Amino acid sequence: MSEKKNLGHNTKKNFLNKPVEHIDITSFDSRDIISSMQKMSFVSRETGNAASIFNEMLKDKNCTIFLTLAGSTSAAGCMNIYKDMVKYNMVDAIVATGASIVDMDFFEGLGFKHYQGSQFQDDSELRKNYIDRIYDTYIDEDELQMCDKIICEIADKLPPKTYTSREFIYEMG
């Protein structure tokens, strides 16, 4: 396992200088490369096989497709993919972690960004700059706390009762 090190950034501005970009799957046709991956090895072959299975699921009118998400995939640049999968009726239901909805989607909906970083960066250097890390992605802790404050304000305005996740997300907008 690699040792963590200071990669020479040293200032918050230097750490947070490359926003993660969310891919637009409607801007290119990847079908040929994905299907050709079935003839490769390791994760490439599994990616090609998964795409083939997913295409069969889309053709089957009796198939219910669940998209399950972890928060880190949204931060990694997949939000537009999920949006387009819903828009083009490629999924029937989404099961997501709270982090996916709150700390990733809502966070970016407020105009904040996730930034490209390094999994090898010394976390103590990040901590000095008030930066959080999800593997190789950085988040400005000040912005994350602003997001949390807004969520608290939303919750504080609600009548006291038990809310389902769906009800609370609705209140978030």
Task: Locate each region found by the language model.
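Metallocofactor- and cofactor-centric catalytic cores in central/energy metabolism, strongly enriched
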Residues: 2-145, 149-163, 167-173
